[in-house]
Amino acid sequence: MNLHEYQSKKLFADYGLPVTKGYVCENVEQALSAIEKLSGSQWIAKCQIHAGGRGKAGGVKVVKSAQEVRSFFTKFLGQRLVTVQTNEQGQPIHQIYLEPCAEIQKELYLSAIIDRSSQRIVFMASSEGGMDIEEVAEKTPHLLHRVTIDPLVGAMPYQGRELAFKLGLSGKQIQQFSQIFCQLAKLFVEKDLSLLEINPLVILKNDELFCLDAKVVVDDNALYRHPDLFSMRDLTQEDPREAEAEKWNLNYVALDGNIGCMVNGAGLAMGTMDIIKLHGGRPANFLDVGGGATKERVMEAFKIILTDSAVKAVLVNIFGGIVRCDLIAKGIVSAINEIGVSVPVIVRLEGTNADLGCEILAQSNLNLIAVNSLTEAAEQAVNAAKESE
């Protein structure tokens, strides 16, 4: 689950990290009231969306007067911001964050992620802050420094000092950086985060370190332990299909293709998408109905897939281990009868009660294409999608 910048900074402040006092505003009146409370004669206005690249898209701007604040809010509030990290529709803007401008001497980069290969938390830091870290890693990898956290002892101050030296910090900055490093590690573990990023972490003109930006992603699987974080969830920033799928315990991820996929099991779902790509097709989604799929869940899965107007064909690939293929078949028939599916549906059933499931599909007199192998299913789906365009 992603947090907005202002929510992330609230977390940072709770852990004693250096952040400015800002105000999140939902209308022009709140914004004009906020700048009266903020210090300085110019401020930063930041559109709050769950995506990076806001600055390059115009969603972050220095505003120097009440009129500029009014113009910025009028232009962006209620609109959608398209960045390099969003789709072509962009993300809706319902809130804008206002904070004082900072006098910056230098920009740094600091983040923490879970490294799957080492199964440890890894901190990454660079003297090239304010840039896309992927670009730094590609063009100047020697400027990206890493520290791995031992889960038995946690983050140690000496590790923070080592990073500080590599970043070229000196004097009191080293001690301050080490404190920031240790507190971020504590925050990461205690709040069950999967990603934490400060870009940029700046050195101010007074030589103090400051968290100018904040990005936090919470592990969805741990949200039950953090009702305070779950209450921060902004459903307007999420794909409505993914939110609806979550209600039915369906694992759904929207993609940009035209072949809808409904599969049981994450591994089989990924394999299905791979074989669609292998035959020249483009998956429209990842959808795992799970091992305990029921007729009702299959119906809802169909509804969710077909809310995507880009879908030109649907491939159903079910291996009946725990789940019974006849129940899946009944769900498919019920869904098509209820929704009125107009795109070709290719079905491959294998495993428990597969023959009975195929018989149910055959007796339905619906426009279903039943196949025996995954290769044939992919070929049929790709061809059907091309013919429907």
Swiss-Prot record:
Its EC number is 6.2.1.5. One of its GO terms (molecular function) is succinate-CoA ligase (GDP-forming) activity. Substrate binds at residues 264, 321-323. It comes from the Bacteria. Residues 9-244 form the ATP-grasp domain. It catalyses: succinate + ATP + CoA = succinyl-CoA + ADP + phosphate; GTP + succinate + CoA = succinyl-CoA + GDP + phosphate. The keyword Nucleotide-binding applies. One of its GO terms (biological process) is tricarboxylic acid cycle. ATP binds at residues 46, 53-55, 99, 102, 107. Signal peptide: none annotated. GO terms for cellular component: cytosol; succinate-CoA ligase complex. Mg(2+) binds at residues 199, 213. It is an enzyme of class 6 (ligase). Binds 1 Mg(2+) ion per subunit. InterPro entries: ATP-grasp (IPR011761), ATP-grasp_succ-CoA_synth-type (IPR013650), ATP_grasp_subdomain_1 (IPR013815), Succ-CoA_synthase_bsu_CS (IPR017866), SUCC_ACL_C (IPR005811), Succ_CoA_ligase-like_bsu (IPR005809), Succinyl-CoA_synth-like (IPR016102). Keywords: ATP-binding, Ligase, Magnesium, Metal-binding, Nucleotide-binding, Tricarboxylic acid cycle. Succinyl-CoA synthetase functions in the citric acid cycle (TCA), coupling the hydrolysis of succinyl-CoA to the synthesis of either ATP or GTP and thus represents the only step of substrate-level phosphorylation in the TCA. The beta subunit provides nucleotide specificity of the enzyme and binds the substrate succinate, while the binding sites for coenzyme A and phosphate are found in the alpha subunit. Belongs to the succinate/malate CoA ligase beta subunit family. This is Succinate--CoA ligase [ADP-forming] subunit beta.
